[in-house]
Regions:
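Formylglycine-dependent sulfatase
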Residues: 2-9, 23-161
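Hydrophobic h-region of N-terminal signal peptides that target proteins for export
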Residues: 15-24
Length: 161
């Protein structure tokens, strides 16, 4: 009798667990979005765009399953403003970062930060229900002000340089 009761309890628990798990899963038809931005990468420097000498098998593999663009222009000729333009969708003359130059204040080097009120891709994706991450070279912050870091601009995860 005890064994029958235990088996019955286990079966009921498994059915309940299955029901709860199946209810929590969503059929999400939105695409996954991975945007790679590389400083100083030319159009023909990837195998997926015709490069024959330099081998880029991992990026080429991603490209086979993805949308590829042929007309993607940097908003600035230097890296920090180009990232600021990409992340905000604004013209380079309308973002707070105009160059890579840092300035000296109280003998401490500080980077010019992206304005905390700038609406970024991270915030846009969050509002659309996506989880987002920024991984790599941010350089749009001041090291001692957390409100200028990537996670403060809508990204759920940030591993920034």
């Amino acid at each position: 009798m005890k064994l029958k009761l235990i088996n019955s309890s286990i079966i009921k628990t498994l059915i309940l667990a299955f029901f709860l798990v199946s209810c929590s899963q969503k059929n999400d038809t939105r695409p996954n979005i991975v945007l790679l931005l590389a400083d100083d990468l030319g159009y023909n420097e990837l195998g997926s765009y015709g490069q024959k000498i330099i081998k880029t098998p991992h990026i080429d593999s991603l490209a086979k399953k993805s949308m590829m663009f042929t007309d993607f222009y940097a908003g600035s000729p230097v890296c920090s403003p180009a990232r600021a333009v990409l992340l905000t969708g604004k013209s380079s003359s309308h973002v707070s970062i105009r160059g890579n130059a840092a300035f000296i204040r109280d003998s401490v080097w500080k980077q010019i930060a992206l304005d905390k009120n700038e609406y970024t891709l991270g915030e846009m994706f969050k509002e659309a229900g996506y989880q987002s991450a920024f991984i790599g070279k941010w350089h749009l912050d001041t090291a001692d002000q957390a409100e200028t870091w990537a996670f403060s601009h809508g990204f759920d995860f940030a591993a920034q340089e």
